[in-house]
A protein has these predicted regions:
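Generic beta-strand or strand-like secondary-structure segments
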Residues: 79, 83, 98-105
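Alpha-helical interface subdomain recognition
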Residues: 1-87, 109, 201-352
Length: 352
């Protein structure tokens, strides 16, 4: 892909991008069936799937070459995230790579965290926009070896001798309450404005990749609903020909394409011109957080009584469409951040 294509609103993928996405799509199709997803729900994590994913290089690709990684771009990472969402893969890849990339930027990938690059150790971060003190819900807190949080103007790495207990959550994530004061190990890895700016970058990347995952989720739930509608008849015609079915499906397709384009554009700017359009990554997240819930709900409605059964794949997609965005706190806080960025830019003094 030409370096400036996404800046020019050309969202086509190169042959390498297509090959990358196809490789991960085939991987999850082979190793992550809906039965695998269901089996992992008690813990929110499939260790075997994670090890297979790491063996493909999914964690090392996200790190720069200076940190022993493969130097993948954020556009590359959105393609992997999309396939994770499509398959509902019970792996903490998004949280892990965002935390590992943050540690890399802060020069904190040391001997204690040597296992992060290849996924032997797991990293988590507090994905909330607002900085809170005391205990907070961490999306992958029950399985992480290292938990990265803000504490005032410090970025700290926490470790627990006994991992925090998983709490039930609608997104079926390995979520846990984490109190920095209760950690067995607390290491300050950076402090000051630069440290907080780098943490904000990690939050933007988390929202970007979560948005991309929701794109894949919506596309798959749309496919499930469409296949159902093509095989069910009423009055001698497939229900897919009825406007009450076909129009919502078309709206899902529009949401998928719009969210995908927005995520890829946000990824390009975050990589190449991060100060030019900082609102794009949180905008992609806010858009997909809303659209994913609406699309997954409609997919359940299209399937009627079958769709609301606990065994239906559509139900698995619905709860995650609603739950995954909440892992970063109230999506409204992200919408407020978008508004603040745009307002600050519009109200900035213009050069004479």
């Amino acid at each position: 892909m030409d370096r400036f294509e996404l800046r020019r609103l050309d969202y086509s993928l190169s042959d390498d991008h297509v090959a990358l996405q196809n490789a991960y799509r085939q991987f999850f199709k082979t190793h992550c069936s809906i039965e695998t997803v269901r089996a992992a729900e008690p813990s929110g994590f499939d260790k075997s799937l994670w090890e297979r994913l790491c063996a493909m290089g999914a964690t090392t690709m996200a790190l720069p070459e200076s940190c022993g990684g493969d130097g993948a771009t954020l556009v590359d990472l959105t393609l992997v995230a999309e396939e994770i969402g499509r398959s509902l893969a019970p792996v903490p890849w998004i949280d892990h790579v965002c935390a590992a990339r943050l540690l890399g930027r802060l020069g904190a990938l040391d001997a204690d965290t040597a296992g992060l690059a290849n996924g032997e150790q797991l990293a988590a971060l507090d994905a909330r926009i607002d900085c809170v003190r005391g205990a907070r819900l961490i999306p992958t807190g029950s399985i992480a070896d290292h938990i990265i949080v803000r504490d005032g103007d410090q970025v700290v790495r926490l470790a627990f001798g006994t991992r925090p207990a998983k709490v039930d959550n609608i997104g079926r994530l390995p979520m846990a309450w984490v109190d920095p004061a209760a950690a067995d190990s607390r290491t300050v890895i950076a402090e000051g404005s630069d440290a907080l700016a780098n943490y904000q970058r990690a939050l933007d990347e988390w929202r970007l990749l979560t948005a991309a995952a929701l794109v894949g989720l919506v596309e798959e739930t749309m496919t499930i609903a469409a296949e159902f509608a093509k095989t069910r008849y009423t009055l001698g015609v497939p229900i897919s020909t009825l406007q009450a079915i076909s129009h919502p499906l078309a709206n899902m397709a529009i949401a998928v394409q719009g969210g995908r384009n927005l995520a890829r554009r946000a990824a390009w700017f975050l990589d190449n011109e991060p100060d030019e359009r900082p609102e794009l990554a949180p905008s992609a997240f806010v858009f997909m957080a809303e659209e994913a819930a609406k699309a997954a709900t409609m997919a359940v409605h299209i399937q009627g009584g079958l769709g609301v059964s606990a065994e239906a794949a559509a139900t698995a997609y619905l709860v995650r469409a609603r739950g995954w965005p909440l892992a970063g706190g109230d999506p409204g806080a992200t919408a407020l951040r978008v508004a603040e960025i745009v307002a600050a830019r519009e109200n900035a003094p213009q050069p004479a």
